[in-house]
Amino acid sequence: MNNFKKRAGGPDIIRVLATLLVMTTHSIAYLGPMNVDIHTPKWTAYLVVRFAALSCVPLFLLLTGYLNRKKKLEKGYFRGILPVVISYLIIAAFSVICTNIGGHTAFGVADSIRSVFDFTANGYAWYVEMYIGLYLLIPFLNILFEHLGTFRNRMLLCIILVCMTMLPAAVESFRVGGVALDIIPEYWEAAYPLGYYFIGAMIGEYQPKIKKRYSIPMALIAILIPSGLCWLYSSPEAGYAWYMMNGFSCITTGAMAVTIFLVLYDIEPPKPVAAVFRELSTCSFEMYLFSYPADLFLYSQTSYFMPFMVLTVFAMSYAAARVMRLVMVPLVYRRLKGR
């Protein structure tokens, strides 16, 4: 009961915000092809919103490092991944049924089973695939973090990881004579989750404070630089400039996510507000996966103002996640425990 009372409100707010931002990025993708002329007022606004929403996955990863930096390699640790796996299996099976009924994809029995285990049953399951691997590594990452010992050593690790995993995407965005500036090795770019994990661990360990008057300008700069450059480099003839700082593994996205995290992580909202965010945060993983069938259904039926669509998907996903957590997950756990 004491742990419940002491639960911080900031991480719950971050998790709910990240869930909303995920749904926002998907909404923009469903509302139209990005190869349209983005220089119209509507698509210019969508472009800025999209770059802001790219902080969604980095926020989740920062939060993982922030909350898990003390986890140790001990008995029972690896059982902790079971809720994630069980939730995924249930929602993946539900997604297969929905895609077959809705006519989006025709799966046979064998293909349906295979799609669950190769993480293609749910279009957003790549995150589950990534998170399982990260979870298995967490105790070992924490050993490294702990034995580095000093702030200087830990900061040096974070700087090296940022240079290896986030800087290449920014540098190669610029082109001379149509040739990308691949002057920084990009081999380790896919390891960006490690960079975010350790940055989150640093924030949790040292609890840095950011002056609020600086946070908004910093976040705006991190949003407007990549979105402005993407706007300039895109054209109706050449299409959308996908190469221009698009993605989670870009230093501008990282700067934006870290700024948002630093603003929110130590917030303590009033108890009624904290209770709402706690409830939504508890269901956020399932909401993320349930948003896939919700997106398929909603965007195949209609297309309204984007905020309305995002909030509708959010509400549908929460309802589905709450039903699953109240009914299906307890039944599965009782089976596993032989009750």
Label each residue range with its predicted role:
Residues 190-193, 208-275, 301, 306:
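Alpha-helical transmembrane segments and terminal signal-anchor/GPI-anchor hydrophobic tails
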Residues 54-72, 127-143, 170-211, 249-269, ...:
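Specific transmembrane alpha-helix
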Residues 20-27, 91-97, 158-173, 220-235, ...:
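Aromatic-anchored segments of alpha-helical transmembrane domains
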Residues 31-36, 100-105, 169-179, 228-241, ...:
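Juxtamembrane "helix-exit" motif on the non-cytosolic side of transmembrane helices
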Residues 1-167, 302-339:
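Membrane-cytosol interface segments of multi-pass membrane proteins
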Residues 274-292:
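Helix-helix packing/entry segments at the starts of transmembrane helices
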Residues 14, 21-24, 59-61, 196, ...:
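Hydrophobic residues within membrane-embedded alpha-helical segments of Major Facilitator Superfamily
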Residues 117-125, 173-186, 236-244, 304:
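Membrane-interface helix caps and helix-loop-helix hairpins in membrane proteins
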